[in-house]
Regions:
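Transmembrane helix-loop-helix hairpins at the membrane interface
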Residues: 5-9, 33-140
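Membrane-interface interhelical connector segments
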Residues: 13-33
Length: 140
């Protein structure tokens, strides 16, 4: 969460103080207007479990035996890319700056996975991060 806040602040400074939101955040906000329960289940339960199993449990673990640095980079970069790819393919190249934020979170989750030797901790961190994001969107 701290990584996200710091990197989003840097991004806003780079963009000249713009308050542009990431495509991922805009998607969250669109769900808020439709079905909060669906958004909660998808964002706080399903996405963290599936994303951590894919990026830490499969990608990082598979690549770590080949090259630890490559494993960290691939896991974090692909995690970040997942959160912006739809906007990029729609032509919004400004979303590239959010690779810093999402990739940073991916790095923190990967580091935690490696140090704790369990996928449960980054899953829980990811769940808490997404829950805090939803709470902030609902009450702000």
């Amino acid at each position: 969460m701290c990584v996200s806040i710091i990197s989003n602040t840097i991004i806003n400074l780079i963009l000249g103080g713009s308050s542009n939101d990431s495509a991922n955040q805009l998607l969250f906000e669109s769900y808020l207007n439709k079905d909060l329960i669906f958004m909660f289940i998808q964002s706080v339960i399903l996405a963290p479990v599936l994303e951590e199993l894919l990026f830490r449990g499969l990608i990082f673990r598979s690549l770590r035996s080949i090259n630890r640095n490559l494993a960290f980079f691939a896991s974090a970069f692909l995690f970040g890319f997942l959160h912006i790819y739809s906007a990029l393919f729609a032509g919004d190249l400004t979303q590239l700056v959010y690779l810093l934020s999402y990739g940073g979170m991916g790095f923190v989750f990967t580091y935690t996975y490696e140090k704790r030797k369990t996928i449960c901790v980054p899953i829980l961190m990811h769940m808490i991060n997404n829950l805090v994001a939803i709470i902030l969107l609902v009450f702000m």
